[in-house]
């Protein structure tokens, strides 16, 4: 019994260290929240928590997408420009379809969203194609597209905001509340569960982790 005790202690210590390494970010987040709570008690009030969730929702949704890229061992520097271009496309398509009398803003906004999603998909396909066709690092590919996409957004909008009387449902997505909870926060949470399901419960998620660990071994 006296011989096994050190082994058990060593195993327990190793298990604890592994847990700390695997959950370092979560633990640091908890420490940060507690520190802010002590310094400013109003930080943990329901109103402030909902406000933080609302303000961080868009960045959080973008971060989930970036996580998949980083897990696969790549990087995308053009995300901010893609967001800007997508927003401009939605507004431009909706406004011009309405001004041309083709469809009202409510329907035009839907078409604009679909066009923006398609453009984002094509940008991602182009990045992947350039990365594998020419063997260019994703850092270089996306660094170049960062400026190109931002320039396209500026050209489309002419450097000025695209103003229009957008439909209520469109505005509701950004400013509305359901049961007192901001809609962006609900979208953020919903995307989290989708992200978790993909990475933890699907073959695609395991493949992404495998590619990030060793792309050549994953290919074989």
What role is predicted for each listed range?
Residues 2-63, 98-111:
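Membrane-interfacial amphipathic/re-entrant helices at transmembrane-helix boundaries
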Residues 22-30, 52, 60, 81-85, ...:
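Hydrophobic alpha-helical transmembrane segments
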Residues 6, 134, 138-202:
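Transmembrane helix-bundle core of multi-pass membrane transporters
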Residues 25-38, 66, 91, 117-120, ...:
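Hydrophobic core segments of alpha-helical transmembrane domains in multi-pass membrane transport
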Residues 99-145:
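Alpha-helical transmembrane segments within multi-pass membrane transporters and channels
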Residues 194-220:
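Membrane-helix/interface signature in polytopic inner-membrane proteins
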Residues 58-59, 87-91, 144-153, 217-220:
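Small-residue-rich segments of transmembrane alpha-helices in multi-pass membrane proteins
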Residues 34-98, 129-135:
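Single transmembrane alpha-helix segments in multi-pass membrane proteins
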